[in-house]
């Protein structure tokens, strides 16, 4: 649990930083000041809204993020054939392992698996009826799958936009989000920069909120209590997640490298979560008749081995 709380802090740092960079792009607010503003807004949302309201707020943000990137994708010329090939047979440039692992960590976000589980468990159901249990399991599966697909789609949209906008036009050195946003202006017009910044701000806010909720869920779980913003454990978990994340931003020199390595840490932690969850969901003692089938276990172990191999590759290449 402590490792997953650290993962939540790493995520919160990246999301607060992303929101702060967006504020800098939109209003020229210094990143460190912007980080504190994002922290205040997120804590206000966490502590003053019931979960249902936060859930609706996050759904609104995610919808707007998707809409923003849809507009940006429509503004550039995408080589969809090359994109399809890249999805199936990706090419890994030299020294790109930290970026690859950071994308993996950003999409999967191991701490959110605990948040998804808590969301399902928090609903009041009659768990003595087989039909209700089956419905719960299907809902959990769909909730997690939908979240993963949305995360994958938004990350893919950003990669496609970067490839079509920068690299096809010879801009091969983009190592800062602010620079990336500014470079969109001469290529696509000022509207593209504003849309990019708005999407980044919404992504930072929504992801920071979920990171705080995940931290609250994990910390409450340490004391065997459910998530509830009115409880002491949940509030402490949110604060333990969000405040250190914001303080770390005040200490780092390169915001962009901070983003990369914080998300890379999530990927490094991912095998621990995967192996633990495979063990628990495959245990008949824990899951009873709902334990993983032999075929599903083989698939899950294969995924775990691949993710572990990627992490080994990360350390072998020396970052």
Where are these regions (language model features)?
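C-terminal membrane-solvent junction of multi-pass transporters and transport-like membrane proteins
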Residues: 57-60, 217, 231-236, 255, ...
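Extracellular/periplasmic helix-exit of transmembrane alpha-helices
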Residues: 120-129, 149-179
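Select transmembrane alpha-helical segments in multipass membrane proteins
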Residues: 1-6, 92-104, 152-162, 186-205, ...
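Membrane-interface loop-to-helix entry segments
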Residues: 37-38, 46-76, 264-266, 270, ...
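Transmembrane alpha-helical segments of multi-pass small-molecule transport proteins
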Residues: 1, 26-48, 64-69, 228-247, ...
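Hydrophobic alpha-helical segments and their helix-loop junctions in multi-pass secondary transporters
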Residues: 63-89, 97, 104-120, 276-285, ...
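Helix-loop-helix module between adjacent transmembrane segments
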Residues: 1-15, 20-50, 105-106, 202-207
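Loop-to-transmembrane helix boundary motifs in multi-pass membrane proteins
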Residues: 35, 146, 191-193, 205, ...
């Amino acid at each position: 649990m402590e490792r997953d709380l650290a993962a939540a802090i790493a995520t919160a740092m990246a999301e607060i930083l992303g929101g702060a960079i967006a504020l800098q792009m939109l209003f020229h607010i210094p990143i460190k000041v912007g980080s504190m503003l994002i922290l205040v807004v997120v804590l206000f949302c966490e502590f003053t809204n019931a979960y249902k309201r936060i859930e609706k707020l996050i759904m609104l943000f995610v919808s707007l993020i998707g809409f923003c990137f849809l507009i940006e994708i429509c503004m550039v010329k995408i080589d969809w054939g090359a994109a399809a090939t890249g999805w199936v047979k990706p090419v890994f440039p030299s020294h790109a392992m930290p970026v690859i692992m950071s994308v993996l960590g950003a999409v999967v976000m191991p701490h959110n698996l605990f948040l998804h589980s808590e969301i399902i468990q928090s609903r009041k159901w009659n768990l003595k009826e087989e039909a209700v249990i089956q419905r719960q399991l299907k809902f959990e599966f769909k909730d997690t799958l939908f979240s993963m697909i949305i995360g994958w789609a938004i990350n893919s949209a950003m990669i496609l936009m970067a490839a079509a906008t920068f690299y096809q036009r010879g801009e091969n050195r983009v190592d800062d989000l602010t620079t990336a946003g500014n470079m969109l202006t001469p290529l696509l017009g000022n509207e593209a920069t504003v849309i990019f910044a708005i999407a980044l701000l919404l992504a930072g806010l929504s992801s920071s909120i979920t990171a705080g909720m995940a931290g609250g869920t994990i910390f409450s779980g340490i004391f065997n209590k459910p998530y509830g913003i009115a409880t002491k454990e949940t509030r402490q978990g949110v604060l333990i997640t969000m405040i250190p994340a914001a303080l770390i931003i005040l200490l780092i020199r390169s915001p962009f490298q901070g983003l990369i390595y914080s998300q890379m840490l999530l990927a490094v932690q991912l095998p621990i979560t995967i192996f633990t969850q495979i063990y628990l969901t495959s245990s008949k003692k824990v899951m009873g008749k709902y334990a993983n089938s032999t075929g599903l276990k083989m698939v899950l172990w294969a995924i775990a081995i691949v993710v572990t191999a990627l992490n080994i590759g990360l350390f072998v290449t020396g970052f």
